[in-house]
Amino acid sequence: MKSRPLPYPDLILYNGKIRTFASENSTCEALACSGSRIVATGTSDEVRRFAGPDTQAIDLKGRVAIPGLTDTHVHLSEKGTAEMELVDCRDFYVDSHSVADILQRLATAASSAPKGSWIIAHGSPMQDFRLTDKRFPDKHDLDRAIPDNPVSISFGAHITVGNSLALAAAKINRDTADPAGGHIKHDPQTGEPTGELHERAQLILKKVAPEFNYLQLKDGIVFALNQCLQRGVTTVHDIVRYAEPVRAYQEILKEGRMHARVSILPRVIESMIESKSLIELGLITGFGNEWLRVGGVKMSIDGGITGRNACFYDPYEDDEHNHGIIRIQQDELNHTVQKCHDAGLRCCVHAIGDRAFDMALDAYENAVAHSPRKDHRHRIEHMGNWLSTPERMQRMVRGGIIAIPNIAIGYYVGDAILDCVGEKRLTKAFPFRTLLKNGVIIAGGSDSPGYWPVDPLRDIAACVSRKMRWGEVWVPEERISVSEAFAMHTTTASWVGFEENDKGTLEPGKLADIAVLAEDPFAIDAERIKDLKVEMTLVGGEVKYQA
Protein backbone atom coordinates (compact mmCIF):
# COMPACT_ATOMS: atom_id res chain seq x y z
CA MET A 1 0.00 0.00 0.00
CA LYS A 2 1.14 3.54 -0.78
CA SER A 3 -0.10 6.45 1.33
CA ARG A 4 0.61 9.90 2.74
CA PRO A 5 -0.06 10.63 6.45
CA LEU A 6 -3.23 12.76 6.38
CA PRO A 7 -6.56 12.95 8.30
CA TYR A 8 -9.59 10.98 7.25
CA PRO A 9 -9.96 11.01 3.46
CA ASP A 10 -12.92 12.72 1.84
CA LEU A 11 -13.47 9.96 -0.71
CA ILE A 12 -12.59 6.32 -1.19
CA LEU A 13 -13.01 4.29 -4.37
CA TYR A 14 -12.85 0.55 -3.66
CA ASN A 15 -13.61 -2.90 -5.08
CA GLY A 16 -12.34 -1.98 -8.52
CA LYS A 17 -9.52 -2.56 -10.92
CA ILE A 18 -7.63 0.71 -10.83
CA ARG A 19 -5.03 1.02 -13.55
CA THR A 20 -2.64 3.57 -12.09
CA PHE A 21 -0.37 3.87 -15.16
CA ALA A 22 2.50 4.39 -12.71
CA SER A 23 4.23 1.49 -14.44
CA GLU A 24 3.36 -1.21 -16.95
CA ASN A 25 0.26 -3.13 -15.75
CA SER A 26 0.29 -1.37 -12.36
CA THR A 27 -3.08 -1.89 -10.66
CA CYS A 28 -4.71 -1.62 -7.27
CA GLU A 29 -8.18 -2.22 -5.87
CA ALA A 30 -8.79 1.07 -4.10
CA LEU A 31 -7.65 4.62 -3.60
CA ALA A 32 -8.38 7.42 -1.16
CA CYS A 33 -8.60 11.17 -1.81
CA SER A 34 -8.30 14.15 0.52
CA GLY A 35 -9.19 17.47 -0.99
CA SER A 36 -8.29 17.34 -4.66
CA ARG A 37 -5.49 14.77 -4.41
CA ILE A 38 -4.92 11.06 -4.00
CA VAL A 39 -3.53 10.14 -0.59
CA ALA A 40 -3.46 6.33 -0.66
CA THR A 41 -3.67 3.35 -3.00
CA GLY A 42 -3.85 -0.33 -2.13
CA THR A 43 -6.27 -3.17 -1.51
CA SER A 44 -9.85 -2.42 -0.61
CA ASP A 45 -9.32 -3.58 2.97
CA GLU A 46 -6.18 -1.47 3.40
CA VAL A 47 -7.65 1.73 2.04
CA ARG A 48 -11.06 1.42 3.71
CA ARG A 49 -9.36 1.36 7.11
CA PHE A 50 -8.58 5.06 6.57
CA ALA A 51 -12.28 5.94 6.31
CA GLY A 52 -13.74 8.35 8.84
CA PRO A 53 -17.36 9.08 9.74
CA ASP A 54 -17.78 11.57 6.87
CA THR A 55 -15.77 9.76 4.20
CA GLN A 56 -17.72 9.11 1.02
CA ALA A 57 -17.15 5.56 -0.24
CA ILE A 58 -17.91 4.52 -3.81
CA ASP A 59 -18.06 0.82 -4.64
CA LEU A 60 -16.66 0.41 -8.15
CA LYS A 61 -18.23 -3.06 -8.35
CA GLY A 62 -15.33 -4.42 -10.35
CA ARG A 63 -15.27 -1.61 -12.87
CA VAL A 64 -12.01 -0.19 -14.20
CA ALA A 65 -10.66 3.22 -13.23
CA ILE A 66 -7.94 5.03 -15.18
CA PRO A 67 -6.34 8.47 -14.97
CA GLY A 68 -8.48 11.23 -16.43
CA LEU A 69 -7.71 11.68 -20.12
CA THR A 70 -6.10 14.72 -21.77
CA ASP A 71 -6.71 16.08 -25.27
CA THR A 72 -3.71 18.23 -26.21
CA HIS A 73 -5.18 20.00 -29.26
CA VAL A 74 -8.75 21.30 -29.30
CA HIS A 75 -10.67 24.42 -30.31
CA LEU A 76 -13.03 24.00 -27.39
CA SER A 77 -14.04 27.59 -26.74
CA GLU A 78 -15.54 27.68 -30.24
CA LYS A 79 -16.86 24.12 -30.28
CA GLY A 80 -19.68 24.30 -27.77
CA THR A 81 -21.16 27.57 -28.98
CA ALA A 82 -21.00 26.38 -32.58
CA GLU A 83 -22.93 23.23 -31.70
CA MET A 84 -25.52 25.21 -29.76
CA GLU A 85 -26.01 28.20 -32.06
CA LEU A 86 -25.08 27.41 -35.69
CA VAL A 87 -27.26 25.80 -38.34
CA ASP A 88 -25.99 22.22 -38.40
CA CYS A 89 -25.12 20.89 -41.86
CA ARG A 90 -22.39 18.46 -40.74
CA ASP A 91 -22.76 15.11 -42.48
CA PHE A 92 -21.20 13.30 -39.51
CA TYR A 93 -24.16 14.39 -37.36
CA VAL A 94 -27.20 15.14 -39.57
CA ASP A 95 -28.64 14.05 -42.92
CA SER A 96 -26.64 16.41 -45.15
CA HIS A 97 -25.29 14.23 -47.92
CA SER A 98 -25.94 16.46 -50.94
CA VAL A 99 -25.91 20.13 -51.82
CA ALA A 100 -29.71 19.97 -51.83
CA ASP A 101 -29.72 18.62 -48.26
CA ILE A 102 -27.54 21.51 -47.11
CA LEU A 103 -29.70 24.08 -48.92
CA GLN A 104 -32.84 22.62 -47.35
CA ARG A 105 -31.44 22.99 -43.84
CA LEU A 106 -30.32 26.56 -44.53
CA ALA A 107 -33.67 27.49 -46.09
CA THR A 108 -35.54 26.07 -43.11
CA ALA A 109 -33.44 28.23 -40.78
CA ALA A 110 -34.00 31.30 -42.96
CA SER A 111 -37.78 30.77 -43.01
CA SER A 112 -37.99 31.62 -39.32
CA ALA A 113 -35.37 34.39 -39.36
CA PRO A 114 -36.02 38.09 -40.07
CA LYS A 115 -35.33 39.20 -43.63
CA GLY A 116 -31.79 40.54 -43.90
CA SER A 117 -30.50 38.75 -40.78
CA TRP A 118 -27.47 36.49 -41.06
CA ILE A 119 -27.71 32.72 -41.37
CA ILE A 120 -24.51 31.22 -39.95
CA ALA A 121 -23.94 27.50 -40.44
CA HIS A 122 -21.27 24.84 -40.30
CA GLY A 123 -20.60 21.72 -42.29
CA SER A 124 -17.86 19.10 -41.98
CA PRO A 125 -14.26 19.14 -43.21
CA MET A 126 -13.87 17.78 -46.76
CA GLN A 127 -17.63 17.33 -47.00
CA ASP A 128 -17.37 18.01 -50.74
CA PHE A 129 -15.65 14.63 -51.10
CA ARG A 130 -18.61 12.86 -49.47
CA LEU A 131 -21.50 14.87 -50.95
CA THR A 132 -23.23 13.16 -53.86
CA ASP A 133 -22.50 16.30 -55.93
CA LYS A 134 -18.75 16.01 -55.16
CA ARG A 135 -18.55 19.77 -54.55
CA PHE A 136 -19.41 22.44 -52.01
CA PRO A 137 -22.43 24.66 -52.61
CA ASP A 138 -21.45 27.96 -54.24
CA LYS A 139 -22.96 31.43 -53.98
CA HIS A 140 -25.44 30.70 -56.79
CA ASP A 141 -26.82 27.67 -54.93
CA LEU A 142 -27.11 29.71 -51.75
CA ASP A 143 -28.69 32.66 -53.57
CA ARG A 144 -31.44 30.49 -55.05
CA ALA A 145 -32.30 28.82 -51.74
CA ILE A 146 -31.85 31.80 -49.41
CA PRO A 147 -32.36 34.98 -51.45
CA ASP A 148 -33.16 37.40 -48.62
CA ASN A 149 -30.50 36.66 -46.00
CA PRO A 150 -26.71 36.80 -46.02
CA VAL A 151 -25.37 33.26 -45.53
CA SER A 152 -22.01 32.06 -44.26
CA ILE A 153 -21.26 28.34 -43.94
CA SER A 154 -17.88 26.99 -42.88
CA PHE A 155 -16.64 23.54 -43.86
CA GLY A 156 -13.99 22.91 -41.24
CA ALA A 157 -11.64 25.65 -40.14
CA HIS A 158 -10.15 26.32 -43.55
CA ILE A 159 -13.02 26.96 -46.01
CA THR A 160 -16.07 29.23 -45.76
CA VAL A 161 -18.72 29.78 -48.44
CA GLY A 162 -20.89 32.89 -48.62
CA ASN A 163 -23.83 33.91 -50.79
CA SER A 164 -24.01 37.15 -52.77
CA LEU A 165 -25.48 39.16 -49.89
CA ALA A 166 -22.70 38.00 -47.59
CA LEU A 167 -19.99 38.75 -50.16
CA ALA A 168 -21.47 42.20 -50.76
CA ALA A 169 -21.49 42.93 -47.03
CA ALA A 170 -17.80 41.96 -46.92
CA LYS A 171 -17.09 43.98 -50.10
CA ILE A 172 -15.72 40.93 -51.88
CA ASN A 173 -16.03 41.21 -55.65
CA ARG A 174 -14.20 40.30 -58.85
CA ASP A 175 -11.52 42.90 -58.13
CA THR A 176 -10.79 41.83 -54.55
CA ALA A 177 -7.22 40.55 -54.32
CA ASP A 178 -6.22 37.50 -52.32
CA PRO A 179 -5.06 38.48 -48.83
CA ALA A 180 -1.67 37.22 -47.68
CA GLY A 181 -2.09 33.60 -46.67
CA GLY A 182 -5.56 33.33 -48.16
CA HIS A 183 -7.41 32.65 -51.40
CA ILE A 184 -10.68 33.90 -52.91
CA LYS A 185 -11.94 31.40 -55.48
CA HIS A 186 -13.08 33.00 -58.74
CA ASP A 187 -15.05 31.59 -61.64
CA PRO A 188 -12.42 31.10 -64.39
CA GLN A 189 -14.90 32.19 -67.09
CA THR A 190 -16.57 35.24 -65.52
CA GLY A 191 -13.94 36.29 -62.98
CA GLU A 192 -16.65 36.64 -60.35
CA PRO A 193 -16.06 35.18 -56.86
CA THR A 194 -17.78 31.83 -56.40
CA GLY A 195 -18.32 32.45 -52.70
CA GLU A 196 -15.61 30.00 -51.61
CA LEU A 197 -12.99 31.54 -49.31
CA HIS A 198 -9.83 29.80 -48.07
CA GLU A 199 -7.73 30.43 -44.96
CA ARG A 200 -7.14 34.15 -44.27
CA ALA A 201 -9.68 35.13 -46.92
CA GLN A 202 -12.33 33.80 -44.54
CA LEU A 203 -11.48 36.61 -42.14
CA ILE A 204 -12.78 39.21 -44.62
CA LEU A 205 -16.24 37.67 -44.34
CA LYS A 206 -16.05 36.84 -40.66
CA LYS A 207 -15.30 40.47 -39.80
CA VAL A 208 -18.78 41.47 -40.99
CA ALA A 209 -20.71 38.33 -40.00
CA PRO A 210 -22.06 38.45 -36.43
CA GLU A 211 -20.04 36.70 -33.73
CA PHE A 212 -21.56 34.87 -30.78
CA ASN A 213 -22.40 37.15 -27.92
CA TYR A 214 -20.45 36.82 -24.71
CA LEU A 215 -23.11 34.93 -22.75
CA GLN A 216 -23.47 32.45 -25.62
CA LEU A 217 -19.71 31.98 -25.59
CA LYS A 218 -19.67 31.21 -21.86
CA ASP A 219 -22.58 28.80 -22.06
CA GLY A 220 -20.95 27.09 -25.04
CA ILE A 221 -17.71 26.57 -23.14
CA VAL A 222 -19.55 25.03 -20.18
CA PHE A 223 -21.51 22.81 -22.59
CA ALA A 224 -18.32 21.63 -24.33
CA LEU A 225 -16.45 20.96 -21.07
CA ASN A 226 -19.34 18.84 -19.83
CA GLN A 227 -19.26 16.90 -23.11
CA CYS A 228 -15.59 16.16 -22.46
CA LEU A 229 -16.41 14.67 -19.07
CA GLN A 230 -18.78 12.21 -20.72
CA ARG A 231 -15.77 10.65 -22.47
CA GLY A 232 -13.47 10.66 -19.44
CA VAL A 233 -11.59 13.81 -20.47
CA THR A 234 -10.50 15.93 -17.51
CA THR A 235 -7.94 18.24 -19.20
CA VAL A 236 -7.86 19.97 -22.58
CA HIS A 237 -5.33 22.23 -24.29
CA ASP A 238 -7.55 24.86 -25.90
CA ILE A 239 -6.43 27.06 -28.79
CA VAL A 240 -8.00 30.52 -28.41
CA ARG A 241 -7.86 33.25 -31.05
CA TYR A 242 -9.11 36.28 -29.14
CA ALA A 243 -9.40 37.65 -25.60
CA GLU A 244 -13.04 36.88 -24.79
CA PRO A 245 -12.57 33.11 -24.23
CA VAL A 246 -9.70 33.83 -21.84
CA ARG A 247 -11.94 36.15 -19.85
CA ALA A 248 -14.84 33.70 -20.12
CA TYR A 249 -12.80 30.84 -18.68
CA GLN A 250 -11.83 32.98 -15.70
CA GLU A 251 -15.45 33.93 -15.03
CA ILE A 252 -16.68 30.36 -15.45
CA LEU A 253 -14.08 29.20 -12.92
CA LYS A 254 -15.13 31.94 -10.49
CA GLU A 255 -18.79 30.97 -10.94
CA GLY A 256 -18.04 27.34 -10.07
CA ARG A 257 -19.09 26.03 -13.50
CA MET A 258 -15.69 24.84 -14.69
CA HIS A 259 -15.68 21.07 -14.23
CA ALA A 260 -12.66 20.15 -16.35
CA ARG A 261 -9.18 21.65 -16.48
CA VAL A 262 -7.96 23.89 -19.30
CA SER A 263 -4.52 24.84 -20.55
CA ILE A 264 -4.98 27.77 -22.95
CA LEU A 265 -2.89 28.22 -26.09
CA PRO A 266 -3.53 31.77 -27.38
CA ARG A 267 -2.97 32.33 -31.09
CA VAL A 268 -0.38 35.05 -31.59
CA ILE A 269 -0.56 35.32 -35.38
CA GLU A 270 -3.81 35.81 -37.35
CA SER A 271 -5.69 36.71 -34.19
CA MET A 272 -6.56 39.57 -31.90
CA ILE A 273 -3.94 38.41 -29.40
CA GLU A 274 -0.34 39.44 -30.03
CA SER A 275 2.79 37.80 -28.68
CA LYS A 276 4.08 41.28 -27.88
CA SER A 277 1.24 41.92 -25.43
CA LEU A 278 1.74 38.57 -23.68
CA ILE A 279 5.47 39.14 -23.44
CA GLU A 280 5.11 42.70 -22.15
CA LEU A 281 2.64 41.49 -19.53
CA GLY A 282 5.27 39.01 -18.35
CA LEU A 283 3.18 35.87 -18.80
CA ILE A 284 5.09 32.61 -19.11
CA THR A 285 4.04 29.03 -19.71
CA GLY A 286 2.51 27.59 -16.54
CA PHE A 287 0.98 30.82 -15.24
CA GLY A 288 -2.33 30.04 -13.55
CA ASN A 289 -3.57 27.30 -11.25
CA GLU A 290 -4.68 23.67 -11.33
CA TRP A 291 -7.84 24.56 -13.26
CA LEU A 292 -6.76 27.22 -15.74
CA ARG A 293 -3.27 27.99 -16.93
CA VAL A 294 -1.22 29.32 -19.83
CA GLY A 295 0.07 26.34 -21.81
CA GLY A 296 1.98 28.23 -24.49
CA VAL A 297 1.23 30.13 -27.68
CA LYS A 298 -0.10 28.92 -31.04
CA MET A 299 0.86 30.07 -34.53
CA SER A 300 0.20 28.62 -38.00
CA ILE A 301 2.55 28.24 -40.96
CA ASP A 302 0.32 26.75 -43.65
CA GLY A 303 -3.33 26.06 -44.24
CA GLY A 304 -5.35 22.97 -43.49
CA ILE A 305 -5.31 19.68 -45.33
CA THR A 306 -9.12 19.70 -45.29
CA GLY A 307 -9.11 22.82 -47.46
CA ARG A 308 -6.27 21.58 -49.69
CA ASN A 309 -4.25 24.46 -48.27
CA ALA A 310 -1.54 22.57 -46.37
CA CYS A 311 1.76 23.44 -48.05
CA PHE A 312 3.69 20.60 -49.72
CA TYR A 313 6.79 20.60 -51.88
CA ASP A 314 4.90 18.56 -54.48
CA PRO A 315 1.47 19.60 -55.79
CA TYR A 316 -1.82 18.06 -54.78
CA GLU A 317 -2.76 14.87 -56.57
CA ASP A 318 -6.03 16.35 -57.83
CA ASP A 319 -4.67 19.85 -58.61
CA GLU A 320 -1.23 19.96 -60.24
CA HIS A 321 -1.00 23.74 -59.85
CA ASN A 322 -1.73 23.76 -56.11
CA HIS A 323 1.04 23.37 -53.53
CA GLY A 324 -1.00 24.88 -50.68
CA ILE A 325 -0.74 28.18 -48.84
CA ILE A 326 1.97 29.66 -46.64
CA ARG A 327 0.38 31.95 -44.06
CA ILE A 328 3.60 33.28 -42.51
CA GLN A 329 7.03 33.74 -44.06
CA GLN A 330 10.14 32.18 -42.54
CA ASP A 331 11.61 35.45 -41.24
CA GLU A 332 8.40 36.42 -39.42
CA LEU A 333 8.09 32.89 -38.05
CA ASN A 334 11.70 32.89 -36.83
CA HIS A 335 11.22 36.30 -35.18
CA THR A 336 7.98 35.30 -33.42
CA VAL A 337 9.29 31.94 -32.22
CA GLN A 338 12.51 33.54 -30.98
CA LYS A 339 10.69 36.24 -29.01
CA CYS A 340 8.32 33.76 -27.40
CA HIS A 341 11.10 31.27 -26.67
CA ASP A 342 13.20 33.99 -25.02
CA ALA A 343 10.22 35.13 -22.95
CA GLY A 344 9.50 31.65 -21.54
CA LEU A 345 6.45 30.98 -23.70
CA ARG A 346 6.30 27.48 -25.18
CA CYS A 347 5.47 27.55 -28.91
CA CYS A 348 2.93 25.30 -30.61
CA VAL A 349 3.36 25.70 -34.37
CA HIS A 350 0.74 24.41 -36.82
CA ALA A 351 2.39 22.66 -39.77
CA ILE A 352 0.62 20.10 -41.96
CA GLY A 353 2.50 19.95 -45.26
CA ASP A 354 6.13 18.84 -45.52
CA ARG A 355 7.33 22.30 -46.52
CA ALA A 356 5.68 23.68 -43.38
CA PHE A 357 7.25 20.91 -41.25
CA ASP A 358 10.70 22.01 -42.35
CA MET A 359 9.92 25.68 -41.74
CA ALA A 360 8.83 24.87 -38.18
CA LEU A 361 11.96 22.83 -37.49
CA ASP A 362 14.13 25.61 -38.93
CA ALA A 363 12.48 28.18 -36.65
CA TYR A 364 12.92 26.04 -33.54
CA GLU A 365 16.54 25.22 -34.32
CA ASN A 366 17.24 28.90 -34.88
CA ALA A 367 15.64 29.88 -31.54
CA VAL A 368 17.43 27.23 -29.50
CA ALA A 369 20.76 27.99 -31.18
CA HIS A 370 20.46 31.64 -30.15
CA SER A 371 19.08 30.91 -26.66
CA PRO A 372 19.82 27.34 -25.55
CA ARG A 373 17.16 25.92 -23.21
CA LYS A 374 16.66 22.20 -22.78
CA ASP A 375 13.19 21.98 -21.28
CA HIS A 376 11.29 24.22 -23.69
CA ARG A 377 8.88 21.46 -24.81
CA HIS A 378 8.06 23.24 -28.07
CA ARG A 379 5.51 21.44 -30.24
CA ILE A 380 4.62 20.97 -33.89
CA GLU A 381 0.87 20.61 -34.22
CA HIS A 382 -0.07 17.90 -36.77
CA MET A 383 3.52 16.63 -37.10
CA GLY A 384 3.31 12.84 -37.13
CA ASN A 385 0.28 12.65 -39.40
CA TRP A 386 2.43 11.85 -42.46
CA LEU A 387 5.80 12.44 -44.16
CA SER A 388 7.79 11.80 -40.97
CA THR A 389 11.07 11.13 -42.75
CA PRO A 390 14.14 9.81 -40.89
CA GLU A 391 15.76 13.24 -41.16
CA ARG A 392 12.73 15.01 -39.69
CA MET A 393 12.48 12.50 -36.86
CA GLN A 394 16.17 12.99 -36.07
CA ARG A 395 15.69 16.75 -35.98
CA MET A 396 12.68 16.35 -33.66
CA VAL A 397 14.59 14.15 -31.23
CA ARG A 398 17.76 16.24 -31.37
CA GLY A 399 15.84 19.45 -30.74
CA GLY A 400 13.49 18.07 -28.09
CA ILE A 401 10.46 18.94 -30.24
CA ILE A 402 7.12 17.27 -29.48
CA ALA A 403 4.81 15.97 -32.21
CA ILE A 404 1.05 16.41 -31.80
CA PRO A 405 -0.57 14.14 -34.42
CA ASN A 406 -4.33 13.88 -34.88
CA ILE A 407 -5.53 10.43 -35.83
CA ALA A 408 -9.13 11.67 -35.65
CA ILE A 409 -8.46 13.45 -38.95
CA GLY A 410 -7.52 10.13 -40.54
CA TYR A 411 -10.40 8.36 -38.83
CA TYR A 412 -13.02 10.71 -40.28
CA VAL A 413 -11.58 12.06 -43.55
CA GLY A 414 -8.58 9.88 -44.39
CA ASP A 415 -10.21 8.64 -47.59
CA ALA A 416 -10.65 12.21 -48.82
CA ILE A 417 -7.05 13.04 -47.90
CA LEU A 418 -5.85 10.02 -49.88
CA ASP A 419 -7.78 11.33 -52.85
CA CYS A 420 -6.23 14.81 -52.83
CA VAL A 421 -2.74 14.11 -51.47
CA GLY A 422 -2.16 10.72 -53.06
CA GLU A 423 -1.12 7.32 -51.72
CA LYS A 424 2.59 7.91 -52.30
CA ARG A 425 2.78 10.60 -49.61
CA LEU A 426 0.51 8.62 -47.30
CA THR A 427 2.19 5.20 -47.43
CA LYS A 428 3.21 5.88 -43.83
CA ALA A 429 0.21 7.87 -42.61
CA PHE A 430 0.08 8.33 -38.84
CA PRO A 431 3.33 6.37 -38.37
CA PHE A 432 3.10 6.09 -34.59
CA ARG A 433 5.06 2.83 -34.30
CA THR A 434 7.92 4.36 -36.31
CA LEU A 435 7.83 7.64 -34.39
CA LEU A 436 8.01 5.90 -31.01
CA LYS A 437 10.73 3.52 -32.22
CA ASN A 438 12.82 6.53 -33.22
CA GLY A 439 12.34 8.31 -29.90
CA VAL A 440 9.91 11.02 -31.01
CA ILE A 441 7.58 12.19 -28.23
CA ILE A 442 3.94 12.08 -29.39
CA ALA A 443 0.78 13.15 -27.58
CA GLY A 444 -2.79 12.86 -28.79
CA GLY A 445 -4.95 15.75 -29.92
CA SER A 446 -8.31 15.45 -31.64
CA ASP A 447 -8.23 18.88 -33.35
CA SER A 448 -11.89 18.90 -32.43
CA PRO A 449 -13.92 21.94 -33.22
CA GLY A 450 -17.61 21.15 -33.75
CA TYR A 451 -16.82 18.73 -36.56
CA TRP A 452 -16.20 15.62 -34.50
CA PRO A 453 -16.26 15.04 -30.74
CA VAL A 454 -13.44 15.24 -28.25
CA ASP A 455 -13.03 11.51 -27.66
CA PRO A 456 -9.62 10.00 -26.82
CA LEU A 457 -11.17 6.53 -26.53
CA ARG A 458 -12.06 6.72 -30.23
CA ASP A 459 -8.54 7.88 -31.04
CA ILE A 460 -6.92 5.21 -28.87
CA ALA A 461 -8.97 2.53 -30.65
CA ALA A 462 -7.82 3.89 -34.02
CA CYS A 463 -4.16 3.93 -32.91
CA VAL A 464 -4.32 0.30 -31.82
CA SER A 465 -6.62 -1.22 -34.45
CA ARG A 466 -5.92 1.25 -37.32
CA LYS A 467 -9.59 0.77 -38.33
CA MET A 468 -10.97 4.02 -39.74
CA ARG A 469 -14.56 5.23 -39.81
CA TRP A 470 -14.59 4.91 -43.60
CA GLY A 471 -13.86 1.20 -43.37
CA GLU A 472 -10.18 0.71 -44.15
CA VAL A 473 -7.53 -0.71 -41.84
CA TRP A 474 -4.98 1.98 -42.65
CA VAL A 475 -1.24 1.18 -42.52
CA PRO A 476 -1.65 -1.67 -40.00
CA GLU A 477 2.12 -2.01 -39.53
CA GLU A 478 2.01 1.30 -37.62
CA ARG A 479 -0.23 -0.09 -34.87
CA ILE A 480 0.84 0.68 -31.32
CA SER A 481 -0.05 -1.07 -28.07
CA VAL A 482 -2.96 -0.14 -25.82
CA SER A 483 -0.47 1.12 -23.22
CA GLU A 484 1.31 3.31 -25.75
CA ALA A 485 -1.97 4.71 -27.05
CA PHE A 486 -3.23 5.55 -23.56
CA ALA A 487 0.10 7.21 -22.74
CA MET A 488 -0.59 9.69 -25.55
CA HIS A 489 -3.57 10.88 -23.47
CA THR A 490 -2.26 10.35 -19.92
CA THR A 491 1.39 10.19 -18.90
CA THR A 492 2.91 11.71 -22.03
CA ALA A 493 0.10 14.25 -22.42
CA SER A 494 0.64 15.41 -18.84
CA TRP A 495 4.36 15.81 -19.46
CA VAL A 496 3.61 17.77 -22.62
CA GLY A 497 1.50 20.10 -20.48
CA PHE A 498 4.30 20.56 -17.91
CA GLU A 499 1.99 18.79 -15.45
CA GLU A 500 3.68 15.43 -14.99
CA ASN A 501 3.94 15.99 -11.22
CA ASP A 502 0.18 16.49 -10.94
CA LYS A 503 -1.49 14.31 -13.57
CA GLY A 504 -1.21 11.29 -15.78
CA THR A 505 -1.03 8.56 -13.13
CA LEU A 506 -3.10 7.59 -10.10
CA GLU A 507 -0.58 7.80 -7.26
CA PRO A 508 -0.45 9.48 -3.86
CA GLY A 509 0.20 13.18 -4.32
CA LYS A 510 -1.37 13.37 -7.78
CA LEU A 511 -4.65 15.10 -8.59
CA ALA A 512 -7.65 12.80 -8.25
CA ASP A 513 -8.71 13.11 -11.89
CA ILE A 514 -10.23 9.73 -12.69
CA ALA A 515 -12.36 8.09 -15.38
CA VAL A 516 -14.36 4.97 -14.49
CA LEU A 517 -15.03 2.66 -17.44
CA ALA A 518 -17.60 -0.10 -17.81
CA GLU A 519 -14.94 -2.54 -19.09
CA ASP A 520 -11.18 -2.94 -19.11
CA PRO A 521 -9.77 -1.47 -22.35
CA PHE A 522 -6.76 -3.78 -22.01
CA ALA A 523 -8.98 -6.87 -22.06
CA ILE A 524 -11.24 -6.24 -25.05
CA ASP A 525 -10.85 -6.10 -28.82
CA ALA A 526 -9.11 -2.88 -29.85
CA GLU A 527 -11.96 -1.69 -32.07
CA ARG A 528 -14.35 -1.85 -29.10
CA ILE A 529 -12.35 0.67 -27.08
CA LYS A 530 -14.07 3.50 -28.95
CA ASP A 531 -17.45 2.25 -27.72
CA LEU A 532 -16.50 1.94 -24.06
CA LYS A 533 -19.04 3.52 -21.75
CA VAL A 534 -17.64 6.05 -19.30
CA GLU A 535 -19.58 5.38 -16.11
CA MET A 536 -18.17 8.21 -14.03
CA THR A 537 -15.63 11.03 -14.24
CA LEU A 538 -14.04 12.62 -11.19
CA VAL A 539 -12.02 15.84 -11.22
CA GLY A 540 -10.14 16.81 -8.09
CA GLY A 541 -11.80 14.01 -6.14
CA GLU A 542 -15.33 15.18 -6.96
CA VAL A 543 -17.78 13.37 -9.20
CA LYS A 544 -18.37 15.73 -12.12
CA TYR A 545 -20.14 13.27 -14.41
CA GLN A 546 -22.12 10.11 -13.80
CA ALA A 547 -23.86 8.09 -16.49
Regions found by a protein language model. Name each.
Residues 260-298, 377-389, 395, 416-441:
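Phosphate/diphosphate-binding loops
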Residues 44, 136-139, 389-390, 429, ...:
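Structural motif corresponding to alpha-helix initiation and N-cap regions
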Residues 1, 143-148, 286-289, 316-320, ...:
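Extended low-complexity acidic/polar segments
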Residues 6-14, 19, 23-279, 295, ...:
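Divalent metal-binding segments
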Residues 252-256, 282-289, 371-373, 396-400:
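Acidic (Asp/Glu)-rich catalytic clusters
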Residues 337-348, 355-378, 382, 397, ...:
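His/Asp/Glu-enriched, well-ordered alpha-helical/loop segment
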